[in-house]
Amino acid sequence: MKAPIPHLILLYATFTQSLKVVTKRGSADGCTDWSVDIKKYQVLVGEPVRIKCALFYGYIRTNYTLAQSAGLSLMWYKSSGPGDFEEPIAFDGSRMSKEEDSIWFRPTLLQDSGLYACVIRNSTYCMKVSISLTVGENDTGLCYNSKMKYFEKAELSKSKEISCRDIEDFLLPTREPEILWYKECRTKTWRPSIVFKRDTLLIKEVKEDDIGNYTCELKYGGFVVRRTTELTVTAPLTDKPPKLLYPMESKLTIQETQLGGSANLTCRAFFGYSGDVSPLIYWMKGEKFIEDLDENRVWESDIRILKEHLGEQEVSISLIVDSVEEGDLGNYSCYVENGNGRRHASVLLHKRELMYTVELAGGLGAILLLLVCSVTIYKCYKIEIMLFYRNHFGAEELDGDNKDYDAYLSYTKVDPDQWNQETGEEERFALEILPDMLEKHYGYKLFIPDRDLIPTGTYIEDVARCVDQSKRLIIVMTPNYVVRRGWSIFELETRLRNMLVTGEIKVILIECSELRGIMNYQEVEALKHTIKLLTVIKWHGPKCNKLNSKFWKRLQYEMPFKRIEPITHEQALDVSEQGPFGELQTVSAISMAAATSTALATAHPDLRSTFHNTYHSQMRQKHYYRSYEYDVPPTGTLPLTSIGNQHTYCNIPMTLINGQRPQTKSSREPNPDEAHTNSAILPLLARETSISSVIW
């Protein structure tokens, strides 16, 4: 039914008045062009879409029905882009059709992308606007195109609704839509706090792991419509001003610099989440902003984001002063601001005094460290260091040049057949290893009483004279030495005691094994307090016999130093050595040989060989370091004139010199040489018979 004429005139006047209200822009050929509408359509290829003419939804106050009734027609044009040629659209009525104020695509193709212009006009008025359509494909392996996503933000611990956008054209008012939701294009078992309502997904309490892409899927006819929304989770909106991390608000920070150098003042602050507002941080000098200063040498760096999490940021900004001058010194303030307030902190740029505190501290620290290391090394390797220095740079002892021996060795002699299992190692060390190492390896000249002292009636005086001729006194404290009080001779003789008390001779006391609990050990402790120059060295058993052990190094360190080569065995057996008993030893050996020759000459022929072998065997057993054997001429006589014209004496038992045989204790067999027992040539004195020669 046609509308009455007056009504049409009124409608036309109303529509014309509506057009006159809108301001024209981009008018061409009498048609107002509103360019491209703000609403853009983005769909995936194969999905349906409805493009509405935007003129009826924001530009004019009328609808398609009223415009058509007023005699206005709606036409559609397509172009590739703004300013391109527009051509009318020929609708095929199936895939692409015009329905009232819209164009329907069922479905879209990639070539459908472009600008669609809708024009309403009559003979007097014309208005035009373009709508953008973008058709894209899914990203590889995904169910969405990352350039066609919607974006939502949610605050931590708060609720959030995610809507399935732009599906109103596909919903039926009489039916509930069947919408499926995916996260990252995969089905998910949703927790109870996530609820679905028609076309929305409600998260009652947002968590950090809710961040991601949510896709809703709706079926429309034979097509599928998908919309994807990316959810970003942030911290709750802050209600506090930013917090300064450096410099601190509560105190003035002083930064020293040198004139002519560069200075860098860095300000760091923490900003809570404030929405899309960027952090505001800057420097000021007094009441002036840095950019307002006349100096180009003073400038600010860009704001740097050091850390960021859920919208909260830690940022920094630096103030750089190139070539610091006197006028650049002073107070600089760092300000931080957000919608909740402003805070600031100050830094005082101060001239550095010419004090090398750091350098001095570093140097002293290095020296102290070097000193500690040196002391530690010296403590651990003192003996090795001193021996090395002495061997390469040391000098011999001058105060001992007039002494014949390097050391006097005092110990208790025990025959090997009397060694027991407990003290055998100590006795072997004292009798064999110690003298052998000192003489043969280190080349020292020792005075060993059992070997070098000829017994006389003045035995104690002879010992004192020999000790006085030695640079060191070595006392070997074996268990037998302690039990027999081997040191008693040093207490009986006044000269020896004074030498120990006054420090005229340095004493080296070698303790073998554990001596505590042994009889007379208390006297050993008293002896130690008596000696002024005393060094105690522990011998810890056979492991100390090794050449590289600490024991030998310590002993060598305490012994006098002299540059000599280690003596050989032949040198140690040389009877021409000079000393307090050098000549006496020569005579002793010759006299012994003469006595032995006389005894053998008068003995029975069968006993000569036996006595000769037995005598020399016993001598070898009792004397380990020097042999007193002498080859007697076959005639059995000894040219005593070879001794020389010097006055010499010896303490040989006169029975041997007279040719007498010692009395045997056995009475089972008669003595073959009994006839010679009373043939004394020289009378024996009481003093001579009282002296025994076993101390050799």
From Swiss-Prot:
Q: Does the keyword Cell wall biogenesis/degradation apply?
A: no
- The residues annotated as the active site are 491
Per the record, where are the segments of Basic and acidic residues compositional bias?
666-676
Q: Which CDD domains match?
A: Ig, Ig1_IL1RAPL-1_like
Any signal peptide, and if so, which residues? 1-24
Top class in the EC scheme: hydrolase
Q: Name one GO biological process term.
A: positive regulation of dendritic spine morphogenesis
Kindly list the cysteine pairs connected by disulfide bridges.
31-126, 53-118, 143-185, 164-216, 267-334
Segments on the Extracellular side according to the record's topology features: 25-357
Q: What is this protein called?
A: Interleukin-1 receptor accessory protein-like 1
Native organism: Rattus norvegicus
